[in-house]
Each structure stands twice: as C-alpha cells, then as structure tokens.
Amino acid sequence: IVGSDDVFDAALRRAGAVRVRSFVALFSAAKCLASRYRPVGKRLAIVTNGGGPGVLAADWVNEILLNLGKLSPETVRALAPQLPPLASLSDLIDLSEDAGAEHFRLAIEAASKDRQVDGVLAIYSPKVGSDSCGVATALAEVKKHMSKPLLACWMGDASVVPARAILREASIPSFRTPEAAVGAFGNIASFYQNQQLLQQTPPPLSTLAKPDIEGARLVIESVLAERRKVLTEMESKTLLAAFHIPVTKTILARNAHEAMMIATQMGFPVALKIDSPDISHKSDVGGVVLNIHSGTAARDAYTDMVQRVARLQPQARINGVTVQNMASARRGREICIGLVTDDPFGPVITFGAGGTMIELIDDRAMELPPLNQFLARRLIERSRVAETLGEWRGASAVDRDALEQVLLRVSEMVCALPQLREMDINPLIVDEQGAVAVDARIAIDQAANTSGGRADNFSHLAILPYPARYEQLWPMRGGGEYLVRPIHPDDAQMLQQLVQNLSPESRYFRFISSMVELPASMLARFTLIDYDREMALVAVFRERTVGADGEIKETDRIVGVSRYVTNPDQSSCEFALVVADDFNGKGLGSRLMLSIMDVARDKGLAEIDGLVLANNPGMLKLMRSLGFVVKPFPEDADFKLVTHTL
C-alpha cells in the first residue's frame, strides 16, 4: 500500500519543502515564491468577470484539496451595493461581464480584508470594449496595501500583453490559465503548512505514563531467540499494552474445549481468530468468527475454523485460536495505524481507514517519527477517513484525543524499539468513548548496531527525538538558578533578543561581524537543528518583573548559548559560545562549555575545537581554565585555535 515515493513526499513535507511534479508547476511555484508572499492558509477567494473560468478555478481548488474562500455575510452586505446588478457573491465573487476596473478593485480589497480568506485570485476574461490595462492597474494599486497573496490570471493572448507587463512590474504573479494560478497558490499553502512541520520540535518520549520498555524488549528478544521475525497476535498486543495502547483481552486456546471455557469466563459475545505465523490476512482463509454468544458455539467455531484453514492453506502452522472480547464497530470507526521501514528514511508511521478492504480503499497518510500532538493531528487530517471522525451517519464524533494518544504511543514504540520493521494495528476501533486495538501484526528484525557507543539508541530514525535527558537545573553564582537545555525552534525570538542586547564588542567577538541582530536565515539555522550532527544548549533564566498594574510577572530569557557542529571527519566538532553581558562572571560560560562537551562526548566525538579572536582575553582565559590547548591559527594570525580532547 505504501510506496517509496510516498515516503519521499513525507520526508520533503517534514523538511518544509514543496514538491512539484512538472516543469510548468516548477516555474509556477518559483514565480509565486519569488514574490515573497508571507505564507498563509489555504482558503482562496476567486474574483472573476467570467463565470466559466471562475468555475474551472473553483473545481481545481477542490481537486488539489484547497478551500474556496467565501466572503463573510458582513463583507457581502457591504460590497454587494457597489457591484454591477448581475454580480454574484455566494461562492465565487463573479462580478459579471459588466465589471470594470473599479469593481475589481473594490472586490479584491474587500476579499483581502475578510478573515475567511487567505489569498485572492483575480481572473480577467477580455470582453469587447473592456480595459484590461485599467483592471491590471487597479490590481497593482490594491496590491500595495495587501498583506495576503494576490495572484492574477489574464485570459487571452496579444490583447492582454500590456496588462501582463503592468502585473509583472507590480510583482503580481500572472498566469494564462485558471488551473495554473490555483496550483501556484496551492504551492504557497503547502509551503506554509510544511514550514509549520519544519518548526515542530521532535518530542521526547512521552511525559505521560511511563511505558514498560524493558518488558517490551524481553518479548522481542524471546521471539528473536526462537529465530522468528513475526510476532503472534498475543505477542503483538503485549507490545502495544506495554506502551499503554488499549487492546482487547486476548487468550490463546489450543483446543476446542479450551476455547469453550475461555469464552465462557470472558463473557459473551466473543470473537475467535486463527493464530498462525504463516497467515497475515486471517479473513482471507476464514480465520475470523465474530459475535459468538455461547460456549457451544465457541467450541464448534474452533473446530470448523481449524478444519477450514487447514483445507485452504495446508502448509500453514497453526498454534491454536485466540479468544477475545468483541469490540463493536457498529458506531465506531475502523482505523489502521501502521509502520513501514524505508531505505533510506527508516521507520514511517501510516494512518488511514482500516478493515478488511484497506488495499482497495488505499487510504494512507504518513509521517516520519517522532510525532508530537500537532504532527499527530495533521497526520489524521491528511487521511480520507478523517471526514468520518466527526458526527457521521447518526454516530457521535470520535474521541480525537484518544486517537492522537495512540499515534503518540506508536511513535514512542518506534523510537524506543529499533527492532520494529512492520506493524499493522488493524482494526483500531475508535468511538466517542476511546480507542481499542482489536488486531495487530508486528514484524521485527535484529537492530543494526550503528550507535557507535553513543548513549542513545535512535540511529534508526531519520529525525532524532528531542534530547530531554540533557535538561539540567544549575545554581547561579550569586544566587538563583538557571535551566540548561537543548534549543527549541520556538526559541528564535529569545535568541534574537539575546543578540540584540549584546554589546557591540560581544557581538563582534561571537560573530566576527558588526551585525546588530541575526538575519532570518541565520536565526532559522541556529534554532532548527537536527540534534544529531549539531547541538545547541541554551541557559534559560526566569526573570521576575513587576508590571504597571503591580502584578509580578515571570518571563523566560535566554542568557547564554553553547553549540557545536560536527566536522566532516565525523570524529571532531567545532564549538561556539556566547553569554549575555549582564550575566558574565556568574559561571554560565564554564557550565555551558562543560555541558556541550558532555553532549559531544556522549555522541562519540573525540575532539572539540574552536577559533577565538586573539584580542579576546576573557574567552582565552576561560578556555585555558577548562583545559583547552591554545595555539596560533596558521591561516590567520588574528585567531587562536583552541582544542580539547574528549
């Protein structure tokens, strides 16, 4: 069901990139993104003087999963009297054939100010006697005061060439067809969504109830010791339960009499399922019987099932039949949560519709682990089955929080158990009361030993979890305490404030530049790190201030940063350090350096080095006190090379 190209899409999306599939789309995307529009949502309002092109554009909006931006009732009431009599504002903003430049200006201006609209597409169809240049000039004027994307589609050829020149001069992306214009806005919307994914901090293992990781590892080790790679249903559910994923109670019966006794003790109704390492799809061979209401029926179902499976798949090894309580899907939805392992991206979590027809439904959204709540929610939203999770055909809306928790727990499993190769929780039945895994199949293999002696065991992941183990509280010289922790993507504003508040000399010592603040690209590079090839630790101090109303407010402030980037030799790293001027002499510099050295050592690096300006005596003194070797830098006499063996 899942192809490598799907995984590549998921990786690009998580990296904040926009993928295009043709040269035409490539140039359309470049034209839009080069206009430096600030990425927004995906609600596109269409303003047109031709109904046909407008409808084509609206159809393509639905086709590529955008939303048609509709004007609010307040905007409609204010705008309608100013438009031609035949204008329609119900879905499209169809100005009719009588529309002129002023009508376009009024409609676009109103749409751009409407909170239900994220971008505006103006489609112009040339009419006899119409002024295409006048309309283009109106767009150019409106664009000066717009903060939302404005795109244009000027239909026609020679007669609208001068108008297109006006649009180009105003930096308004212009397209020849409605579909191309809508697709270009789709690129902006995708860029916005993917940039949100890029800024998500890879979460640590769940801070909720601690999973029984050791118990799960014992199950895996016992299976591998038996030279098996596919877990039984009971073993699979044991793994899920170890990570607090709700499962139906399941007991293995090895003969018909045991099946009858177990079913009677569990209470009816029950379900019986064949237990065989050689059968992946039990229903295909008649290996599932549901809604059994008596002990006699359970005994007979066991006998019939074993005989039926032996006839249809005689080579299959049969361990027995599992007996489990029925989990009714009458008002619940059947979901499939899975895991596939890709080369080279590693484990990938999948989500979609479950049941016996998943291959035909072909509903699979996917995301690279680890997940946080935002990523789990977005994963659900990208699936087609998401439309059925609200109130649907008389059924109540499902417990979304419970569904998201299962995804977070699966992510936790994937991070903690590198032996996992494949997993299908199908079906996971979810309703308004929660979620429960009814069936599960897990395949494993020996974990590759690629950690290089590192303390973590996440080398199987394309994206490392947030390393919460490096968070530590430290006392500050002179009183108080501060938190040293790995940097977050949302630390950008605090990091910028740290740099802005540095003295010119301190900024020059750190950046060898007279900059007064970090450029946006550098700020992103400093905060969006992978926690693998590079690491940044920040010292966070909680300041207490008295507001104008007399209330005491607590605000966090970054007062120091240490970081390293792994060198190309993969055995050493280069560091950088900065401390707020008003926190010098309080022990922050030495603590941040010792902490970043501990991280580098933990990662298996052998040496840490850096360049220090020769006229920075304070930094050189700190380096010597920490045991660094200070020597001239042969390529530039203005610097000293400082090194320390880890």
Short names for language-model regions:
Residues 1-48, 52, 58-69, 136-231, ...:
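Peripheral docking tails and interdomain loops at the edges
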Residues 1-15, 82-94, 116, 121, ...:
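Gly-rich Lys/Arg/Thr-decorated short loops/hinges at beta-loop-alpha junctions or inter-strand turns
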Residues 24, 30-40, 208-333, 341-345, ...:
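Active-site nucleotide/adenylate-binding loops and adjacent lid/helix of ATP-dependent enzymes
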